[in-house]
């Protein structure tokens, strides 16, 4: 399984590659889009101006492509807003053509109407080598949906955050059986920003002024009659307490599920990191690389989980914010 990490500026490319990323993805918002639509109609799912979360100029695209040629770690570009208005589609296609001119061929898309527009109005892009990754911001993912989306010549499915491992395995095995001539790639979320919703039904803003909802701490549990959440007692602190903000996977972690994800047929692992501190993302990439190395050298799932936790969580306390329920 390959590590796919998000970057927010070209300065992050080399550190993330050296940390162990196999692929990278980013957003690109050119000035023409910002001037006309601002952040009210975002080009991707980061409605942000004031910190590094987007590539913003053609020159940056050109510089980053030189890095890709040097390090051979590809970059895909996200056009993954949940929807666009009709007048925007022609501009989006123009931006995609511009990206392809500089060597970028892979785009992450969530809006079904954009896929329809591309197929009907810009079929030449596929002839030029365009690849489509179906975003984790797309709505429900099931076998019938995958059959329908094959009409748009997708190359990869990014499962959304609420797909169970058994669901993924069922869909992947079905696709392999029904389409042996054209195998897809399959990507699953593995670290950070475990959304309270699924991406398609998240209508919060990922912007400068408001905290991301996926980073607002919360706790699930039963509340006794007559008790309010603010009166609930917090868990007793461990004798070897860690700083939660520095813990791997504090906002979402699927490391324990790597064994089952591999069995299910997952080929790529998404590390959510656009806009995060560079040092934090490098730590996360290294931790995931360590977990994958342990996975390759253990004989069974309990052995893997035990070894991984001892290596990455030496105090014995992980975040407990699990992406997947592993039983």
What positions do the PLM features span?
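Active-site pocket-lining/capping segments in soluble small-molecule metabolic enzymes
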Residues: 1-140, 159-327
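A cross-taxonomic marker for long C-terminal extensions/tails that follow the last structured domain
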Residues: 147-157
């Amino acid at each position: 399984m390959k590590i796919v990490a998000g970057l927010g500026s070209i300065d992050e490319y080399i550190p993330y590659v050296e940390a162990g990323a196999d692929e990278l993805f980013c957003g690109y918002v050119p000035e023409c889009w910002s001037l006309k639509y601002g952040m009210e109609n975002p080009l991707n799912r980061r409605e942000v101006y004031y910190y590094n979360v987007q590539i913003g100029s053609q020159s940056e695209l050109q510089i980053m492509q030189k890095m890709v040629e040097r390090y051979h770690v590809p970059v895909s570009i996200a056009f993954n807003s949940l929807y666009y208005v009709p007048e925007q589609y022609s501009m989006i296609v123009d931006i995609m053509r511009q990206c392809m001119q500089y060597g970028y061929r892979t785009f992450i898309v969530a809006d079904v109407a954009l896929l329809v527009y591309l197929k009907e109005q810009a079929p030449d892009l596929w002839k030029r080598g365009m690849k489509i990754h179906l975003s984790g911001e797309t709505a429900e993912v099931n076998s019938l949906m995958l059959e329908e989306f094959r009409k748009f010549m997708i190359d990869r499915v990014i499962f959304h955050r609420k797909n169970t491992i058994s669901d993924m395995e069922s869909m992947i095995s079905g696709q392999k059986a029904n389409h042996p001539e054209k195998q897809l790639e399959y990507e699953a979320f593995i670290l950070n920003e475990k959304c309270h919703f699924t991406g398609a039904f998240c209508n919060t803003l990922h912007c400068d002024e408001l905290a991301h909802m996926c980073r607002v701490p919360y706790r699930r549990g039963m509340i006794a009659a007559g008790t309010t959440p603010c009166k609930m007692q917090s868990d007793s602190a461990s004798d070897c307490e860690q700083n939660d903000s520095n813990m791997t996977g504090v906002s979402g972690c699927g490391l324990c599920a790597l064994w089952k994800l591999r069995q299910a047929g997952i080929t790529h692992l998404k590390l959510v990191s656009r806009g995060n501190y560079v040092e934090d993302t490098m730590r996360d990439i290294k931790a995931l690389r360590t977990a994958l190395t342990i996975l390759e050298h253990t004989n069974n799932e309990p052995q893997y989980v035990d070894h991984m936790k001892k290596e990455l969580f030496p105090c014995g306390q992980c975040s407990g914010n699990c992406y997947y329920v592993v039983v």
